[in-house]
């Protein structure tokens, strides 16, 4: 079975507290985009076999897809094995939920392959054990996510919007960013409820004008390239630009393909990982 695992961007990201176990409590609007990994998932006699087109992708339990497969097999007493080939297109350590997207795709595919009568809600409760972005990746589309990411409210679709992604040539540790965020003072927070209302009313201009990601207070301060990329996007008439997740990828919305392509080709001169895509 071939399945697509879609990346995401954060239209807003706010940290509102911290649980006793150390996980941060969040309010986020998340959006799927048409940049995806392709997973070829097949039944084998036993075990979990992971392969990939990329050498730097782990093939053991450090891989979220591996952990998702094991959790599903243990939970539903699967007596067969599974092989997963990951054709990786989503950049890693980028703030795009590349690993979580793969984990979510594995859970959904295994539900179908092994014909298990399991709801999305049950998969979400499983998935959150191994990755806070997995619940959203199971649901996809446009959604408001709360808790540590497991409380999902579907929003009106914002599909078809043109986005250019620029990932600087370094990765960022999510754990490091959240640890450093705890030391931040005087943080500007997004109007999460106002943004949710705007999304549901189709007020896209309000949405792009009011995007806030509080984690920029860490990543964009540590890496000056993030603000440089955002400034360049605005020079090329982006209608809204922000860092996704813990970074370092910057996504920028454009009104039309022509302007997006100008910016795309300009950024390709400097960065290896630049993509034109759309929201889905």
From Swiss-Prot:
Record-annotated active site: 8, 133
Any one Gene Ontology BP term: isopentenyl diphosphate biosynthetic process, methylerythritol 4-phosphate pathway
Residues binding ATP, per UniProt: 91-101
Keywords from the UniProt entry: ATP-binding, Isoprene biosynthesis, Kinase, Nucleotide-binding, Transferase
Leading EC class: transferase
GO molecular function: 4-(cytidine 5'-diphospho)-2-C-methyl-D-erythritol kinase activity; ATP binding
Domain of life the protein comes from: Bacteria
EC number of this enzyme: 2.7.1.148
Functional description taken from the UniProt entry: Catalyzes the phosphorylation of the position 2 hydroxy group of 4-diphosphocytidyl-2C-methyl-D-erythritol.
Record family assignment: Belongs to the GHMP kinase family. IspE subfamily.
Protein name: 4-diphosphocytidyl-2-C-methyl-D-erythritol kinase
Organism of origin: Clostridium acetobutylicum (strain ATCC 824 / DSM 792 / JCM 1419 / IAM 19013 / LMG 5710 / NBRC 13948 / NRRL B-527 / VKM B-1787 / 2291 / W)
